[in-house]
Structure formats: structure tokens, C-alpha cells
Amino acid sequence: MPKYKPRHPGGMTIVTTPSMAPMAKQAHEILESKIKKKSIGYAEIKYDSFSRCEVLPIIQGNVRGKHVYLFLDFNGNDWMRDMFVSQLTISAIQDAGADKITLVIPTFPGQRQDRKDRSRVPISAKVVIQALTNFETVVHVITLDMHAEQLEAVFPRAPDHLPGFVIFAPWILETFHDRMDQVVIVCPDAGSVKRNQRLAKRVNVPLCFLEKNRKGRGDNDVIAIHGADVEGKICIVNDDLLDTSGTMAKSGVTLLDHGASEIHLTGTHPVFGGDAYETLAQTGHPVVVTDSLATREHDWLTVLPLAPYLAEAILQNNIEDGSVSSLILNGLPT
């Protein structure tokens, strides 16, 4: 283990919103176990509510002079309210004397609105990123599997952007270790090909993608399969966002019609909008996601923890010659 070398004399502190506390606590424990004899602070944020929907963030710990790693989430049903509360939280930490703030945000809202696809509309993802990073003490961001890589250019400084394959590749290798010759990675649409090429290369299996006839937002029919043959294969359909999941369900039907022996539906960010739970349950296929967003428990749903990866990213930012790229290239150290 390289020598621990904090970026500034004040050391670092993990601060978390209530719903991110389980992930933040686990990350804190991992960091404490790896950085021997070095105390890493931990504090949670309490939110008091008042009339007219006013919210007051209260930091339950000392952050003065610290480099704060702030775990933020957008688990609520009203992400625009979550945005404002997040800004209040960042402001409170800054005003409490934090030296620097790194935002740890597994997923941002508004990511699918990443470009102007018609006139007189905003690039919402850009607005969200700028609103969260436009603070003097916010110096860095750690995030996961953004919908479009070009969003990295919006940040004041390039974020530590962990791709989804870093999490899903170990799961695939562990789950199908004795059947890897039967595995095919499936792109549910052409837009996910680049992302899944990396996953397929990491686990050394073939790739195919489904061509869709797009009728409207969230309404698509699969019309063709291109690439690897899926007959008799274990098909792992992978995407970054699982929202209403209608396309995922249709993908499963198409793959079965083409002779797939087994289907697993996977996605980094479980948005699960509308009737997604019912839609996915009715497919009869196992579903695997990360805990970037809160989910309900179901027998068919497996949730992979992000804490080890986020902890490693934080660690690599605080050791001599640390490199988050090594985490992306090689996975978690054994």
C-alpha cells in the first residue's frame, strides 16, 4: 500500500446526507481499515423542516479546515427540490469552514437531457452540474457511469468518472466463472454499444446489439439483432439507466425468440420510474443494479454495493502517486 499522504494538513472527513449514510459509513470503514493509524472524520447531516417547505441543513460534526467528501443523492421523487437542498448543504459546509469539498454523487439527475435536440430547450444536465459545482470550495467530483461522456467537459475540472463495467465485470466473472464461454453481452440499443464494448472486452466475451424502432420517449420496438449469435447463450443485457424498463422487457422477449437460454437484465442506475418494478417482475429474468439510487427489496433484484469503489477512488486521491485510472483499468485491488 502506498504511503497515505493527505492533500492538505487538515485531513479529510466523510459527510453524508441521511439516505446515503449506509454507503458513506461502509466507505468510511474501508478507508479507516486501509489508512492505518489515521483518523478520518465522519459526520451526518440533519435536516430540519419548517413551514412553506423550508429546509435547514445541520452538519453534525466539525469540518473546519478539512477536505470534505460529501455523499449526495437524489433519491427523492422531486429532484428539483433535492437540487436546492443539495446547494444549501454545500453552502452550509463551506460556511462551516471546510477547506475543500469533493462531491461524491453516484448519479446526477437530468443526464438524458445532455444536448439540444430541438430549438428553445435547455441542456438540463449542464445546468445541474454547474449548479452543484459553482461553489468556491467545491474542487472535485466523483461520479459513476454518466449517460454521456461529453458531460465531463461541463465540470470545472474533469471528474473522477467511474464507468459501469468496473462494477459489473467482477460480478459477471464471479457469477458465470465456469460458463464464461456461453456469455454474450447485449446492448439494448445502439447508444450503449461503446459502453458495452468495454464491458465485453473486460470479461472477454462477444457482443451484440439490438436495433430499435423508436416511436417516442420510452416507447421502442426491437426489430433486429446485430453481432454475436445468442442462440443457446447466457445473455447479459446492460445499460446505464433502468427507468420504465419497457425496452429491457422487450429485449428479453426478443432474445428468447432468438433462442437465448438465459437472460440477465443489468443497469447501473435503478431509476425505476412508472411501473418499472411490475414490468421487470413480469419478465421473470433476474435484474442486477447498483445502489446508486435506493430500491425496494425483491427476490429477483440483486444490488451491487458501490462503497468499495468509491472508497478506493477517495483513497487514490490521498496517497502518493495515487491513480483512479488504476481502479478503472485493473478493478479493486485484491
Which residues does each predicted region cover?
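PRPP-associated nucleotide enzymes
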Residues: 1-334
